[in-house]
């Protein structure tokens, strides 16, 4: 959803398959709002996916992307990077963040959070994105959001409210859950929103082949 529910969103997202049974979910928030921010965030995702498909390790791909943003232009532009890499064979997920909002993992009886204190891509030349690995099980849901989602909720209660929304719904379809969360945030928070808002949800299920 774009700022004011009308403008073009500066957020971009993508889900794609990588060799070796890996699946990526990437969410990027470009600086500011509107078309320029959208181009910036879309470019970050496109380049990261190309580097990963070419076989570069994720840390190397992020470093190259950051260098391109820092050195490639005179005007200051930066984008957050929130990436989840799912190993479809082991159930492990690597969460890599640069300036991104928390990720919420919905378990059977609790919500876990993945945080980042790393700066966004394009701010400093030497950047090491933060990485956390978690083992996921069937039924888990991974909820990724841009900061506009949290900023729309009452100050000091953002994460608590989102926890309650995620935990309190029986919705298991990722697409439906993403739409539900956006709708509830608009109901409970600032409407129209003062920043772009994006929710990206991935569900984990065991599939047995006979």
Tell where the protein language model's regions lie, with residue ranges.
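PP2C/PPM family metal-dependent serine/threonine protein phosphatase catalytic domain
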Residues: 1-12, 62, 66-72, 101-133, ...
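Active-site-proximal, acidic helix/loop segment immediately C-terminal to a metal-coordinating Asp/Glu
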Residues: 33-54, 136, 140-192, 208-209
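Juxtacatalytic helix/coil linker segments
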Residues: 1-27, 32-33
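Catalytic core of PPM/PP2C metal-dependent serine/threonine phosphatase domains
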Residues: 38-108, 186-195
């Amino acid at each position: 959803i774009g700022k004011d529910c009308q403008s073009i969103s500066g957020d971009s997202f993508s889900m794609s398959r990588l060799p070796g049974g890996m699946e990526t979910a990437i969410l990027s928030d470009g600086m500011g709002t509107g078309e320029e921010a959208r181009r910036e965030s879309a470019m970050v995702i496109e380049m990261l996916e190309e580097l990963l498909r070419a076989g570069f390790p994720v840390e190397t791909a992020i470093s190259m992307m950051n260098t391109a943003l820092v050195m490639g232009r005179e005007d200051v532009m930066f984008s957050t990077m929130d990436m989840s890499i799912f190993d479809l064979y082991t159930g492990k997920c690597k969460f890599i963040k640069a300036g991104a909002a928390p990720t919420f993992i919905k378990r059977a009886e609790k919500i876990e959070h993945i945080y980042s204190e790393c700066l966004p891509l394009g701010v400093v030349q030497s950047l090491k994105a933060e990485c956390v690995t978690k083992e996921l099980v069937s039924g888990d849901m991974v909820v990724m959001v841009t900061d506009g989602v949290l900023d729309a909720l009452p100050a000091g209660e953002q994460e608590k409210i989102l926890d309650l929304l995620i935990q309190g719904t029986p919705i298991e379809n990722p697409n439906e859950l993403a739409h539900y969360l956006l709708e509830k945030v608009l109901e409970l928070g600032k409407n129209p929103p003062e920043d772009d808002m994006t929710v990206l949800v991935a569900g984990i299920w065991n599939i047995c082949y006979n």
